[in-house]
Amino acid sequence: MPYLLISTQIRMEVGPTMVGDEHSDPELMQQLGASKRRVLGNNFYEYYVNDPPRIVLDKLECRGFRVLSMTGVGQTLVWCLHKE
């Protein structure tokens, strides 16, 4: 899975950071220390870590991922990463 989306809401200085969905690579999620959860009202699972986005981006860079783009959607910040 060469593409990865991560996001955070409201403040980027603190976590949590969403790092994947139920179809994400379980090995990568384990390396990031991510927990799987299902928020009340949603019919899907997501992986999250309590780290702020900067820490997550540093960890992903060490694993060969590079940021392709970043955007803000309302109060949500989203990064798209790719691994060669």
UniProtKB/Swiss-Prot annotation:
It is found in: Nucleus; Nucleus membrane; Cytoplasm, Cytosol. GO terms for cellular component: cytoplasm; cytosol; dendrite; intracellular protein-containing complex; melanosome; nuclear membrane; nucleus; protein-containing complex. Liver and kidney. Somewhat lower level in testis, heart, brain and lung. GO terms for molecular function: amino acid binding; GTP cyclohydrolase binding; GTP cyclohydrolase I regulator activity; GTP-dependent protein binding; identical protein binding; protein-containing complex binding. Its main location: nucleus. Signal peptide: none annotated. GO terms for biological process: negative regulation of biosynthetic process; protein-containing complex assembly. Pfam families: GFRP (PF06399). The keyword Cytoplasm applies. InterPro entries: GFRP_sf (IPR036717), GTP_CycHdrlase_I_reg (IPR009112). Keywords: Cytoplasm, Membrane, Nucleus. It comes from the Eukaryota. Belongs to the GFRP family. Mediates tetrahydrobiopterin inhibition of GTP cyclohydrolase 1. This inhibition is reversed by L-phenylalanine. This is GTP cyclohydrolase 1 feedback regulatory protein. The gene is Gchfr.
